């Protein structure tokens, strides 16, 4: 069933964190995460980055570019990785509309950049120069061009598209709208029914709480807590993960439950509300109108999604 390979390699359960070509959802997630970490509430700057309008002389932009090229696998181990760029191109060459000779030329140009010092400025300067000389090409190779992205989503329903939350996307795979167990999940965050094992595997990976190799990512869980202005529960999360007795066959569900029990339902659901709303559009935090956490707005939006799910 196609749904079971949601998010490409993520749900397929890749057994290492070695880089592999990324689908448009993965790219969009990493792009937005880097923007959140570096835009410093400069919403005008974030708008420029979304359009790949990258200024060579701007310090924030330089460190954003470093974050982005590392997250997308273009730069690793103190060097640009032309083979990774070529692999990304090959994975979607029937969709990206880029000539292979052009892709190879750009990959090779990036490979020549001397950025061994790992500094933001060294990485960004060369990258921006190559990108500016080949406007729009890397956006197509990395599936950020809207026409390329939309075509891939249309052909690959196993990939979560923009506009649907991670919990609705996973819920539709394993439950029927209005189903009692599903409504229990939506209202309380957990269910003992067998379907929840698969559902939590989907959501936990989609939230990036679980890595491709099956390990839990403590930093991703804490990121969600901090996003809802809860900064005093880091140790609770750490202890919940350390003390969790998870079984291989239900690993995601078991860790999910350990975190749930550690934080308590109220706080856990507060975090999930935010993640659900943000997951519909990864640029949610980058818009001034929705940049500040508003618990009431989150709850109102999630209630609307509950109604959509007939819960």
Curated annotation (Swiss-Prot):
Keywords: Allergen, ATP-binding, Disulfide bond, Hemostasis impairing toxin, Nucleotide-binding, Platelet aggregation inhibiting toxin, Secreted, Signal, Toxin. GO terms for biological process: sensory perception of smell. It comes from the Eukaryota. Disulfide bonds join 34-67, 63-120, 170-202, 183-311, 244-258. InterPro entries: PBP/GOBP, PBP_GOBP_sf. Its main location: secreted. Residues 1-16 form the signal peptide. ADP binds at residues 146, 149, 153, 160, 281-283. GO terms for molecular function: ATP binding; IgE binding; odorant binding; toxin activity. The amount of D7L1 in the salivary glands of 5-day-old Culex quinquefasciatus is approximately 31 ng. During the blood meal, mosquito injects approximately 7 ng of D7L1 into the host. This is Long form salivary protein D7L1. It comes from Culex quinquefasciatus (Southern house mosquito).
